[in-house]
Amino acid sequence: MFSQSACVQVHIKTNELHTAVVEKVILAMISSCRTDNNQALHKLLHVAVCEENYNV
């Protein structure tokens, strides 16, 4: 299972509501492709969502 995203953990103290929404989006995206063969895709989705929301 894909671990909780680092950016969500970092930002949760400063923007809990927004972070909770982002976390749900990430988890929903991950749950749609949850296989061992898709680990790279999981990481790409995680990075894309984090960059979209936090400009990291």
Curated annotation (Swiss-Prot):
Keywords: Differentiation, mRNA processing, mRNA splicing, Sexual differentiation. GO terms for biological process: cell differentiation; male sex determination; male sex differentiation; mRNA processing; regulation of mRNA splicing, via spliceosome; RNA splicing. It comes from the Eukaryota. Disruption phenotype: Male-specific lethality in embryos. Male determiner protein (M-factor) that controls male somatic sexual differentiation. Acts as a dominant factor that regulates the mRNA splicing of doublesex (dsx) transcripts and promotes expression of male splice forms of dsx. This is Male determiner protein Yob.
